[in-house]
Curated annotation (Swiss-Prot):
It comes from the Bacteria. It comes from Treponema pallidum (strain Nichols). Its main location: membrane. It is a multi-pass membrane protein. The lineage of its organism: Bacteria, Pseudomonadati, Spirochaetota, Spirochaetia, Spirochaetales. Its EC number is 2.5.1.145. It is found in: Cell inner membrane. The keyword Transferase applies. One of its GO terms (molecular function) is phosphatidylglycerol-prolipoprotein diacylglyceryl transferase activity. This is Phosphatidylglycerol--prolipoprotein diacylglyceryl transferase. A 1,2-diacyl-sn-glycero-3-phospho-(1'-sn-glycerol) binds at residue 159. The keyword Phosphoprotein does not apply.
Length: 332
């Protein structure tokens, strides 16, 4: 078989048949823990004191308080943004109390908070961190830079959580690392009667049984692509960029640009939400399950373009401010 079958022993629940403890939630804990450890490491090396506008030392309580505000901002922002941008039936607009309701409306079973948006989480983190630094008289940009260098490695585990949930998978592919994901909804399977489906299945070594109505084709494991590029690679870039930082805000702007660039291109491998489809497309009939044109642009890619523009704009503005400030101080 020229594809990989998703491991049958992987389950969303840490304890089988006990839905309250899931790998996805545990990966969030791992992600925040790694970010916290890397943040503390930089503080101990004096990297925050060096760029801070106050001489008051950073305490353990300061870091914990900052992380508490930031994490709350991430969770609230990610959930609210997801329900307001990615849900088109306006259910949460009519009944906003359901945004944080963890039970199924149909069965009453515990399902957790399904739907968390990265872009909303980023906005929430900036708001939460900004409120904390403002109320404590700290430099927001200095703290944001340290957080930016700490975040991507933890983010890696968030995407691994998506993989363990077998969600946010990519478009169909015939490359050897294509993966056949379990529990794919019927809407994401393909009619066995279609000649191209049978030909595609034969090409990847899938035997279509006689009488089968639908075929589950292999897809890009886009969660792993994102974990590697938006997590590990971006973290390496930012961790090294700490040495060439010349002004506050440089690292957080670099993070925003870097994430936007990586995510924009990986979106071409990831399948867009079926109910949203493409925001822009050269042809109105482009299927979301197959890459056909670079001009097929998803909602996530539009948000990434906005991130890139905001990050570059921030770099330009902060660099110009730093140069003017340096000239002013030199004249004093």
């Amino acid at each position: 078989m020229l594809s990989i079958v998703y491991p049958s022993w992987i389950r969303p629940e840490i304890i089988p048949s006990f839905p309250y403890f899931r790998w996805y939630g545990f990966m969030y804990v791992v992600a925040f823990s790694i970010a916290y450890i890397l943040f503390r490491y930089q503080v101990r090396r004096g990297e925050l004191d060096k760029w801070s506008r106050v001489s008051e030392p950073v305490t353990q309580d300061d870091i914990m308080s900052f992380f508490t505000w930031t994490i709350l901002g991430i969770l609230i922002g990610a959930r609210v943004f997801s329900t307001m941008v990615y849900e088109v039936d306006l259910l949460y607009m009519r009944k906003p109390w359901l945004i944080f309701w963890p039970f199924s409306l149909q069965t009453g079973e515990w399902v957790g908070l399904r739907g968390m948006s990265y872009h909303g989480g980023l906005i929430g983190a900036l708001v939460g961190g900004g409120l904390w630094t403002q109320s404590h008289g700290r430099s927001f940009l200095a703290w944001a830079d340290v957080a930016a260098a700490s975040t991507p490695l933890g983010y890696t585990f968030g995407r691994i959580g998506n993989f363990l949930n077998a969600e946010l998978y990519g478009r169909i592919t015939d490359i050897p690392i294509g993966m056949i994901f379990p529990n794919v909804p019927l809407s994401d399977m393909f009619p066995a009667s279609e000649p191209w489906v049978r030909e595609f299945a034969q090409r990847v070594g899938i035997h279509v049984q006689e009488g089968a109505r639908l075929v589950n084709l292999p897809r890009h494991p886009s969660q792993i692509y994102e974990a590697f590029f938006e997590g590990i690679v971006l973290w390496c870039i930012l961790w090294c960029a700490r040495r060439v930082k010349t002004y506050n805000g440089f690292l957080v702007c670099l993070y925003v640009v870097g994430y936007g660039v990586f995510r924009f291109f990986i979106e071409y491998f990831r399948q867009p939400d079926a109910h949203l489809g493409y925001r822009f497309s050269a042809t109105q009939s482009s299927p979301i399950y197959l890459f056909q044109s670079w001009s097929d642009v998803s909602t996530g890619q539009i948000l990434c373009v906005l991130m890139i523009l905001a990050g570059l704009g921030g770099m330009f503005a902060l660099s110009a401010y730093h140069k003017r400030d340096s000239v002013r101080k030199a004249r004093v």
